[in-house]
UniProtKB/Swiss-Prot annotation:
GO cellular component, one term: cytoplasm
Regions of this protein lying in the Extracellular compartment: 44-130, 297-323
Catalysed reaction equations from the record: chloride(in) = chloride(out); iodide(out) = iodide(in); taurine(out) = taurine(in); 2',3'-cGAMP(out) = 2',3'-cGAMP(in)
GO biological process: aspartate transmembrane transport; cell volume homeostasis; cellular response to osmotic stress; cyclic-GMP-AMP transmembrane import across plasma membrane; monoatomic anion transmembrane transport
Protein name, per record: Volume-regulated anion channel subunit LRRC8E
SUPFAM superfamilies: L domain-like
Family, per entry: Belongs to the LRRC8 family.
């Protein structure tokens, strides 16, 4: 016997593959099992029983066509004697009296019969009658291989296994049920008519365990059972759902690129149809070649004495019936293949629309898919459309964002966020969130927060809950794309005062920020296009009715004309141009009310003429430009309110004498230039409180320095001073005196008259001793005295102790 288990390897496959087997494939599979059983049964009979039985024909014949075996059909079956064959003549019209019958003697032994049987089986029996069961087995195995080839082929099986694995996890995920129930609940509030249809589908009645209805509806029951626990999703389940979203994205990107699965399925179906047609034709033609009586002619006279035989094919009757049965099964199998082809070509299987799922669930952003991804979903629908519905949840960005939000809320509770609160230099209580996948809802429970900084937070969505942050004044968006809902924008529009936006791409600038009418400070940091027409972010500032401070750190070639939209209330305007030459500054003339102007790293070679028309200007900062001369400084006398002038980090070689015209100057910063001489006219600016001339090439300090009776800060470090005039110590209000990195050999004892001195820097000079009069500087402490330790030890003990006192 041939054990059927030997054929198990040809039909064995993973049970999970059943979701990709529509009804016609299942029917075809069972038909192949039936055909395989027919073939195996025939092969078993062929191997275990006699194939053919032959008897000699006493009439000699040279060829097979001359052998007449028709009398065997008319005679009764043979007797039990194997060597004798008794023939009974047919009855005649006139009955003759009974007579004794005698058989024919063939004078052949058993070996001769076996030899003749084998010779006639090989030469006289038609090949179809001999190999019919083997052909059935072979053809059936080919059908089985064709039907399951795409489950085994490496290029397709990997995708199928991956898809089935993801599909099962998506179906069983608690997040699937929760997302469907939440969205359906929201949809029911907006669309009562949809509520009834969704409830009828999802809210099936609970059947008792073991009831027949439970067995009939396993998937619906499972959905209902999960709905009861859908409201609770722990952290582990949330992480698993998050991983599923990533897997679905990668799988979709990988599978939608080609149509290998569709092509393989179609080719194997076409191959099955072609094979079906071929097998049907030749079987229908040759089934008549199976005969019960077979004439045989072999040249065996020398061995047996006979050359013609009449043979009986013992299994002919059974094989003919099996062949007809096989053809019937084959016909049904062929019909399933033809229907498969009809299904393949009738419908657009390379496109799959979730329109019905979107309408039913209310999740409106589920995308349609194509190519192989669409094809496998069509197959899944033939098994159970509920799989596609639950799988669609993991294609929705809305669903993913809700899950991300839920995971964020688990990871960042309000107490944990409060631990991250810090004070900014301005004294505000700030919460800094860095590299989060979103904005946790728990942020809006920290009501004491005054400043919120979001750095590299992906897709931050500011919900209406922001209205709970009643103390929120400042918002910082650093490489972060932030979106706001309408209610959120209405609140921010009236409450947000300070906004900072740092971006690498201009698309990261949210356009809603230009509608914040209560905004007082706007700081933009990032690269903008040189063509301002391509900068939609700066198209209009007209809505910023309260803007007082505007800072742009970018690479502008000219000042945006839209700055004029806020000219009526702008008080401070700053441009940090990062080394890009600022060519056009005509727009500055419109900023008549500006009090502070900063043009940093703009590659300016002279003081811009547009500045001189700013009559309300109080602070001018031209840091890190390429100024070589400042002869135009005389025109600054038109800026009558100018009190702070910062020309630091430039290449200025001298100070023009007409600087004396700037009578209102209170701060002058000329540090890090190339100044050699300080003109005495500078000290006619007798309102100076802050004078910084550090890191220049100054060798002498004019005695007129004593005129500056209001001076509180004097920076002369990093020069070539060898001596200090005694008049310097007439500046009784000096609080900070920086003399480090010079060539001073001593410090005048008159330094003791500087009773307000808080900070004194002397490190890097050529002094041997310090005057004991430092003890008279009652405001000076050791922490404010910057000097070498060895030089400090030259002071008397009592002076040192006094300086060390708190």
């Amino acid at each position: 016997m041939i054990p059927v288990a030997e054929f198990k390897q040809f039909t064995e496959q993973q049970p999970a593959f059943k979701v990709l087997k529509p009804w016609w494939d299942v029917l075809a599979e069972y038909i192949t099992y039936a055909m395989l059983m027919i073939g195996v049964f025939g092969c078993t009979l062929q191997v275990t029983q006699d194939k053919i039985i032959c008897l000699p024909n006493h009439t000699s014949a040279d060829v097979v066509s001359q052998i007449t075996c028709q009398e065997y059909d008319q005679q009764s079956p043979p007797s039990n004697d194997s060597d004798l064959e008794t023939t009974i003549p047919p009855p005649t019209a006139t009955s003759s009296p009974p007579r004794e019958m005698s058989g024919l003697r063939n004078n052949l032994d058993l070996q001769q019969y076996s030899f003749i049987n084998q010779m006639c089986y090989e030469t006289a029996l038609h090949w179809y009658a001999k190999y019919f069961p083997y052909l059935v087995v072979i053809h059936t195995l080919i059908f089985i291989i064709c039907g399951n080839f795409w489950f085994k082929f490496p290029g397709t099986s990997s995708k199928i296994e991956h898809f089935i694995s993801i599909l099962g996890k998506c179906f069983d995920s608690p997040w699937t049920t929760r997302a469907l129930s939440e969205v359906s609940g929201e949809s029911s509030q907006e669309k009562p008519s949809q509520e009834r249809s969704i409830d009828r589908e999802l809210s099936k009645p609970n059947f008792e365990e073991g009831s027949p209805a439970t067995a009939d509806l396993p998937i619906a029951e499972k959905l209902v059972a999960e709905t009861s626990s859908a409201s609770v999703l722990d952290k582990k389940e949330g992480e698993q759902a998050k991983a599923l979203f990533e897997k679905v994205k990668k799988f979709r990107h990988h599978v939608e690129e080609g149509d290998l699965l569709y092509s393989m399925y179609m080719r194997q179906t076409v191959l099955k149809v072609c094979k079906f047609v071929l097998i049907t034709i030749y079987n229908a033609v040759l089934v008549g070649k199976i005969h019960f009586i077979v004439p045989c002619s072999v040249h065996t006279e020398d061995m047996t004495g006979y050359n013609s035989f009449c043979c009986n094919h013992t299994k002919a009757h059974l094989f003919s019936k099996l062949a007809i049965t096989y053809l019937c099964f084959l016909g049904v199998y062929g019909l399933t293949c033809l229907y498969t082809l009809y299904w393949l070509f009738r419908r657009p299987l390379k496109e799959y629309s979730f329109r019905s799922v979107r309408e039913e669930t209310g999740i409106g952003d589920i995308p349609d898919v194509k190519n192989d991804f669409a094809f496998v979903l069509h197959l899944v629908d033939q098994y159970d459309s509920l799989y596609s519905k639950r799988f669609a949840v993991f294609l929705s960005e809305v669903s993913e964002s809700r899950l991300r939000q839920l995971n964020l809320n688990h990871e960042w509770p309000a107490d944990k966020l409060r631990q991250k609160l810090q004070h900014t230099p301005e004294g505000r209580l700030e919460l800094h969130l860095f590299k989060l996948p979103g904005l946790p809802d728990t942020v809006f429970e920290v009501a004491e927060m005054e400043s919120l900084k979001l750095e590299m937070v992906n897709e931050a969505l500011i919900p209406p809950l922001v209205s709970k942050l009643v103390r929120l004044e400042e918002l910082s968006l650093i490489n972060c794309t932030a979106k706001v809902q309408h209610a959120s924008l209405a609140y921010l529009r009236d409450h947000l005062r300070i906004l900072q936006v740092k971006f690498d791409d201009i698309k990261e600038i949210p356009l809603w920020i230009f509608s914040l009418r209560a905004l007082e400070e706007l700081h933009l940091f990032g690269w903008l296009s040189q063509d301002l027409s391509k900068n939609p972010a700066l198209e209009s500032l007209r809505e910023l009715k309260s803007l007082k401070v505007l800072t742009i750190k970018s690479n502008l070639s000219k000042i945006p004309a839209t700055v004029a939209d806020v000219a009526g209330h702008l008080q401070k305007f700053s441009i940090h141009n990062d080394g890009t030459k600022l060519l056009t500054l005509n727009a500055l003339k419109r900023l008549a009310l500006v009090k502070e102007l900063e043009l940093v790293r703009c590659e300016l070679e002279r003081i811009p003429h547009a500045v001189f028309s700013l009559t309300n200007l109080q602070v001018l900062d031209l840091k890190e430009n390429t100024l070589h001369t400042i002869e135009e400084i005389i025109s600054l006398q038109h800026c009558r309110k100018l009190s702070v002038l910062r020309l630091w980090h430039n290449q200025i070689a001298y100070i023009p004498e007409h600087i004396r015209k700037l009578k209102g100057l209170e701060e002058l910063s000329l540090n890090r230039n190339k100044i050699l001489v300080i003109p005495s006219q500078l000290f006619l600016c007798n309102k100076l409180r802050h004078l910084d001339l550090s890191n220049n090439e100054i060798r002498e300090l004019p005695p007129e320095i004593g005129v500056l009776q209001l001076l509180q800060y004097l920076g002369l470090s990093g020069n070539f001073l060898e001596d200090l005039p005694n008049e310097l110590f007439f500046c009784q209000k000096l609080k900070t005196l920086k003399l480090g990195q010079n060539r001073l050999g001593n410090l005048s004892p008159k330094v003791g008259s500087l009773v307000c001195l808080v900070k004194l820097e002397l490190k890097g000079n050529r002094m041997d001793t310090l005057p004991p009069e430092l003890g008279n500087c009652v405001s000076l402490k050791r922490s404010g005295l910057t000097v070498e330790p060895s030089l400090f030890e030259t002071l008397p003990v009592e002076v040192r102790d006094k300086l060390k006192e708190d």
